[in-house]
């Protein structure tokens, strides 16, 4: 078994909507990023890569490479996870915490779970996505951006 932790943050800017967990969410602003700015999938990608000591999303998909400009983070997650599966690992469980003052995430978390489970080839019951605020404190509380943390347990498949 291997445990990984991922963290990502993006600043609000430009026009909405935003994409979080592969879900398009209406909002007055977008998230500034080289790719689509999906903080959930970026944190998840970092967690799975970190669990198997394969670096992070920025190493695998550098923001200096124009090929990833505006990239769909679901595509990036699938590519990263294919490398993790090639090492013989599968998802045990994944726990995601979105830290955002706005917009409200609860209506969207069920679809986020479905998207992530599909991308990671696991059951939706292995995926948890929840959201919290910072009680109006800090950059998140001032609605300047969104952050996300992810913790994953990977299980090595037996070669029987």
UniProtKB/Swiss-Prot annotation:
Its cofactor is a divalent metal cation. It comes from the Bacteria. GO terms for molecular function: 2-C-methyl-D-erythritol 2,4-cyclodiphosphate synthase activity; metal ion binding. It is an enzyme of class 4 (lyase). 4-CDP-2-C-methyl-D-erythritol 2-phosphate binds at residues 8-10, 34-35, 56-58, 61-65, 100-106, 132-135, 139, 142. Pfam families: YgbB. Pathway: Isoprenoid biosynthesis; isopentenyl diphosphate biosynthesis via DXP pathway; isopentenyl diphosphate from 1-deoxy-D-xylulose 5-phosphate: step 4/6. A divalent metal cation binds at residues 8, 10, 42. This is 2-C-methyl-D-erythritol 2,4-cyclodiphosphate synthase. It comes from Proteus mirabilis (strain HI4320). The lineage of its organism: Bacteria, Pseudomonadati, Pseudomonadota, Gammaproteobacteria, Enterobacterales. The gene is ispF.
């Amino acid at each position: 078994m291997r445990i990984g932790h991922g963290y990502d943050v993006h600043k609000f800017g430009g026009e909405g909507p935003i994409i979080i967990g592969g879900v398009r969410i209406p909002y007055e602003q977008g998230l500034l990023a080289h790719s689509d700015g999906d903080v959930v999938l970026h944190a998840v990608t970092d967690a799975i890569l970190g669990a198997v000591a394969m670096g992070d999303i920025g190493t695998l998909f550098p923001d200096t490479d124009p090929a990833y400009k505006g990239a769909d983070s679901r595509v990036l997650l699938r590519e990263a996870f294919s490398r993790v599966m090639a090492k013989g690992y599968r998802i045990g469980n994944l726990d995601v915490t979105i830290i955002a003052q706005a917009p409200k995430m609860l209506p969207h978390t069920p679809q986020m779970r479905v998207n992530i489970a599909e991308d990671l080839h696991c059951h939706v019951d292995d995926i948890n996505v929840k959201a919290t605020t910072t009680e109006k404190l800090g950059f998140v509380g001032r609605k300047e951006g969104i952050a996300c943390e992810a913790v994953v347990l990977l299980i090595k498949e037996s070669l029987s």
